[in-house]
Amino acid sequence: MNRLYVGSEVGQLRRVLLNRPERALTHLTPSNCHELLFDDVLAVEAAGVEHDAFANTLRTQDVEVLLLHDLLEETLAIPEARQWLLNTQISDFRFGPTFARELRHALNHLDDHHLTTLLLGGLAFSELHLESDSMLPKMRQPLDFVIEPLPNHLFTRDTSCWVYGGVSLNPMMKPARQRETNHLRAIYRWHPIFAQHPFIHYFGIDDLHYDNANIEGGDVLVIGKGAVLIGMSERTSPQGVENLAAALFKHGQASKVIAINLPKHRSCMHLDTVMTHMDVDTFSVYPEVMRKDLPTWRLTPKGNNGDMRVEQVPSYLHAIEQALGVDYLKIITTGGNSYEAEREQWNDANNVLTVKPGVVIGYERNVYTNEKYDKAGIKVLTIPGNELGRGRGGARCMSCPIERDGI
């Protein structure tokens, strides 16, 4: 049965969307990596091998793995989807009317696989064999990008997030990631896996300009029992939280949203870099950031039209306990001394992916934290991450659950 539903963070994971690192990462250089939101350049072939190990580990846990390149390629085989995506990604406003028309025409003659590779991986002017009467190509240098690469597509968690019976197609904060959402819009609209089955679109499905209403999936934890935990990081705004909450309440998909105000810095760019859900009553936390006194609000529905009540609460931990109906939470902090804990948090020790209650996937390099998880009764399925970890994202960042059981 094809079921598009994510009922928790810790129930049995059944289907997940990944994106294998390929062409886009070959375009990362020391001079452009920061603009493209990376701290370093990766050895792409080695990163691909590590990613394959991640995907295979998921498969050993009876998780169906969908790959973004495959889904987008299959979507582009549908003429209506291909035309929409070319018009959206190669717009007159982005390229100028003459060059946009010429470029769309050239790209439309490519086969589905090649077009997918360029849309995800980027295209330089030196690779574009096109005579144009437009100003733009005449003014650019050969190594300038016609189509910017999207290396952050590696982190499928952020671009869209499935919350109970629907999906949010997230308006991304950073320009380097904003085009990613259109690929997911096309896939969720036209690909047979999604087009043939009903689900709710909460947010981001249309062509609106969302201004300051940004939200990214790394900040959204579907903790279960009708509750959603959202971090207001440097990439998720209060406006984004309220818009998603309003849609969840309007559609009767959630009864409460807990919103935590996070420090706005790189080491905790998303909530899941400092806090993840590992078992019904167990969380991994980096205590240097996730202090007990972080400002926290609880949003609950007022009526059934999306209106809400907003109240500040004294403790996010107590709010989570109430939402889950547990007496107290079991908190596992990052391992090692203060130096080791800071290093391991930076290398995504807290960013684990739970595949079933008490079983998580994480990088093998985080030995101190993994040892603490093991002693606390959490089974860690380790994967290599010396290259993938350079992207500042762990197993949770690199995965978008499509189907997961509740608790």
Curated annotation (Swiss-Prot):
Query: Sorted alphabetically, which keywords does the UniProt record give?
Result: Arginine metabolism, Cytoplasm, Hydrolase
Active site as annotated: C397 (amidino-cysteine intermediate)
Q: Which SUPFAM superfamilies match?
A: Pentein
| Pathway in which the depicted protein is active | Amino-acid degradation; L-arginine degradation via ADI pathway; carbamoyl phosphate from L-arginine: step 1/2
Per its UniProt entry, what is the enzyme's top EC class, as one word? hydrolase
This protein's GO cellular component annotations are: cytoplasm
EC number, as in UniProt = 3.5.3.6
Per the record's keyword annotation, is Hydrolase included, yes or no?
yes
User: Is the keyword Hydrolase in the record?
Assistant: yes
What are the BP-aspect GO terms? arginine catabolic process to ornithine; arginine deiminase pathway
Localization in the cell: Cytoplasm
Query: Which Pfam families does the annotation name?
Result: ADI (PF02274)
Q: Which PANTHER family match?
A: ARGININE DEIMINASE
- Family assignment from sequence similarity: Belongs to the arginine deiminase family.
Name-wise, this protein is Arginine deiminase
Q: Which organism is it from?
A: Vibrio cholerae serotype O1 (strain ATCC 39315 / El Tor Inaba N16961)
